[in-house]
Amino acid sequence: MPDYLGADQRKTKEEEKDDKPIRALDEGDIALLKTYGQSTYSRQIKQVEDDIQQLLKKINELTGIKESDTGLAPPALWDLAADKQTLQSEQPLQVARCTKIINADSEDPKYIINVKQFAKFVVDLSDQVAPTDIEEGMRVGVDRNKYQIHIPLPPKIDPTVTMMQVEEKPDVTYSDVGGCKEQIEKLREVVETPLLHPERFVNLGIEPPKGVLLFGPPGTGKTLCARAVANRTDACFIRVIGSELVQKYVGEGARMVRELFEMARTKKACLIFFDEIDAIGGARFDDGAGGDNEVQRTMLELINQLDGFDPRGNIKVLMATNRPDTLDPALMRPGRLDRKIEFSLPDLEGRTHIFKIHARSMSVERDIRFELLARLCPNSTGAEIRSVCTEAGMFAIRARRKIATEKDFLEAVNKVIKSYAKFSATPRYMTYN
């Protein structure tokens, strides 16, 4: 198409077009642009949000929540007279122990308290405490002037015993445990059924089993099942390693066992898991030197707490060991450990399931034959199969690949199962189980 204007005139028109000044938007235009894309009730919602922010600001100013840079409230909000009165009314209390209650059934009972390393006093109750709150042998808080009882105190528990309580639930569930289907069912019958359906045992007139012994070769899933139980139940879970109860001084281990069960009785329902119980539960014998006397005292205290004169209450006890033949017969008898669950080596189906569990969190090929891998790992424990999966990932990392192939798993089987066979202690433990 011919250009009738000419190249020079067209260039001049384009320059005039570019030289037009850019007009800035005024406030009205900006407000109009902000309304684009808003819903019908946007203005009302914005107004309500502004009102809420203003109210929160006023509340914070009145309550003094917003503090200054020094970490203190503004001086205008200080109330020194009230603070002084509070300090005078709430004096620090002294810890004592109520040893005896005189005339407990009368309207004006008296309490004999023993202040440690000081003296004994016969005192009254303050107005804040009811007579039913105080029992003989209980620790109480008394004031320093009249020695009146102000508050009942919880029993004294060693901090090392308190730290054995598991606060956070483990992330292991029953679906993460492979090759232990029968063992998990037996464990749930003892632990979960009495807590969730106690009426079944009441109707039959029997007491549920209160103690379980988990035994088997290393790496078969004993501790893993206990972690799954802790995740499943809402009861308090306390984990104790047997060697923690072996103390330096005489009587310390027995005292820790006593305080452990005392703390467990304060809970609504409690599970105590003793791992490696053969550290303190070995059969008693006299070696002539008396080196194991303290360990035997600890075990005797444990035996007494499991089934002694005092009732155990709603406390379930789980114990795990690799050597059940070394445990004391008094610890193994029914009433203390009612059920013995053996964790044997997983079969072909169990090994295949364990491979799938560990491969679930890995980047692997889709067509890996896990049953073939399980057949190549006879008499292997779950821990060894987990090591195979880890080594397969290491082979993939060495080859700079993002996924693990079946070849990596086969090489890992040759390395872990075949090469490390001389380090395996499973056959040795199988002779004892």
Swiss-Prot record:
<dbReference type="InterPro" id="IPR012340">
    <property type="entry name" value="NA-bd_OB-fold"/>
</dbReference>
<keyword id="KW-0832">Ubl conjugation</keyword>
<dbReference type="GO" id="GO:0000932">
    <property type="term" value="C:P-body"/>
</dbReference>
<feature type="compositionally biased region" description="Basic and acidic residues">
    <location>
        <begin position="8"/>
        <end position="21"/>
    </location>
</feature>
<dbReference type="Pfam" id="PF21236">
    <property type="entry name" value="PRS7_OB"/>
</dbReference>
<dbReference type="GO" id="GO:0022624">
    <property type="term" value="C:proteasome accessory complex"/>
</dbReference>
<dbReference type="Pfam" id="PF00004">
    <property type="entry name" value="AAA"/>
</dbReference>
<protein>
    <recommendedName>
        <fullName>26S proteasome regulatory subunit 7</fullName>
    </recommendedName>
</protein>
<comment type="function">
    <text>Component of the 26S proteasome, a multiprotein complex involved in the ATP-dependent degradation of ubiquitinated proteins. This complex plays a key role in the maintenance of protein homeostasis by removing misfolded or damaged proteins, which could impair cellular functions, and by removing proteins whose functions are no longer required. Therefore, the proteasome participates in numerous cellular processes, including cell cycle progression, apoptosis, or DNA damage repair.</text>
</comment>
<dbReference type="InterPro" id="IPR003959">
    <property type="entry name" value="ATPase_AAA_core"/>
</dbReference>
<dbReference type="InterPro" id="IPR003593">
    <property type="entry name" value="AAA+_ATPase"/>
</dbReference>
<dbReference type="GO" id="GO:0006511">
    <property type="term" value="P:ubiquitin-dependent protein catabolic process"/>
</dbReference>
<feature type="modified residue" description="N6-acetyllysine">
    <location>
        <position position="116"/>
    </location>
</feature>
<keyword id="KW-0067">ATP-binding</keyword>
<keyword id="KW-0647">Proteasome</keyword>
<feature type="modified residue" description="N6-acetyllysine">
    <location>
        <position position="422"/>
    </location>
</feature>
<dbReference type="Pfam" id="PF17862">
    <property type="entry name" value="AAA_lid_3"/>
</dbReference>
<dbReference type="GO" id="GO:0016887">
    <property type="term" value="F:ATP hydrolysis activity"/>
</dbReference>
<keyword id="KW-0007">Acetylation</keyword>
<keyword id="KW-0547">Nucleotide-binding</keyword>
<dbReference type="InterPro" id="IPR041569">
    <property type="entry name" value="AAA_lid_3"/>
</dbReference>
<dbReference type="InterPro" id="IPR027417">
    <property type="entry name" value="P-loop_NTPase"/>
</dbReference>
<dbReference type="InterPro" id="IPR003960">
    <property type="entry name" value="ATPase_AAA_CS"/>
</dbReference>
<dbReference type="InterPro" id="IPR048723">
    <property type="entry name" value="PRS7-like_OB"/>
</dbReference>
<dbReference type="GO" id="GO:0036402">
    <property type="term" value="F:proteasome-activating activity"/>
</dbReference>
<comment type="subunit">
    <text>Component of the 19S proteasome regulatory particle complex. The 26S proteasome consists of a 20S core particle (CP) and two 19S regulatory subunits (RP). The regulatory particle is made of a lid composed of 9 subunits, a base containing 6 ATPases including PSMC2 and few additional components. Interacts with NDC80 and SQSTM1. Interacts with PAAF1. Interacts with TRIM5.</text>
</comment>
<comment type="similarity">
    <text>Belongs to the AAA ATPase family.</text>
</comment>
<dbReference type="GO" id="GO:0005829">
    <property type="term" value="C:cytosol"/>
</dbReference>
<feature type="region of interest" description="Disordered">
    <location>
        <begin position="1"/>
        <end position="21"/>
    </location>
</feature>
<keyword id="KW-0597">Phosphoprotein</keyword>
<feature type="binding site">
    <location>
        <begin position="216"/>
        <end position="223"/>
    </location>
    <ligand>
        <name>ATP</name>
    </ligand>
</feature>
<dbReference type="GO" id="GO:0005524">
    <property type="term" value="F:ATP binding"/>
</dbReference>
<keyword id="KW-0963">Cytoplasm</keyword>
<dbReference type="InterPro" id="IPR050221">
    <property type="entry name" value="26S_Proteasome_ATPase"/>
</dbReference>
